[in-house]
Amino acid sequence: MKMKYYFVIFFLILAMFLVGCGGGVTPATDEAKIKSVISEFCLAINDQNWSKAKSYCVYGSEEYYQACYIEDMFNTYHLYCDLVTINFYIDIDNVSISGDYSEVYGYLTLVMSACGEIYNDSGYFWQYLQKVGNTWKIYS
């Protein structure tokens, strides 16, 4: 009789764990999506994947053309230098969301080297994003 109760209790506990692990995926919050877009944008710049970097921007926006400018600058340096590297990082301090628009405050670091010269730029900045459909895109 005791063995029966153990099996029932074991089965109930197992059922509770399996229901808790039902495979349901928690949807990412808008803040997580925004941080991901900015992180992926930086990675695309670092990988020199210009089309991917621009895909994280609103087409024709200030940030879209900034990515085009970085690409042109990078390609121009490549005409004169064999090795050109770029490291672009953003450390996000705050994300504020208002409807389909978001403001991100953080610290930006850009290090580019070409022909033995190093170009550094860093400082605090504001980044602005717009929700297009279900996707956040950088516009300024």
Predicted regions and their residues:
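Generic cytosolic/nucleocytoplasmic N-terminal low-complexity/intrinsically disordered segments
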Residues: 1-3, 32, 130
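Sec-dependent bacterial lipoprotein signal peptides
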Residues: 1-19
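Short, low-complexity N-terminal intrinsically disordered segments enriched in polar/charged residues
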Residues: 10-11, 20-47, 55
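Prokaryotic Sec-type signal peptides and long signal-anchor helices
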Residues: 11-15, 45, 78, 92, ...
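Short solvent-exposed beta->alpha transition segments
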Residues: 35-36, 50-97, 101
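A generic structural signal for ordered secondary structure
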Residues: 40, 44, 65, 71-78, ...
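Exposed beta-sheet edge and beta->alpha loop/turn motif
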Residues: 82-84, 94-140
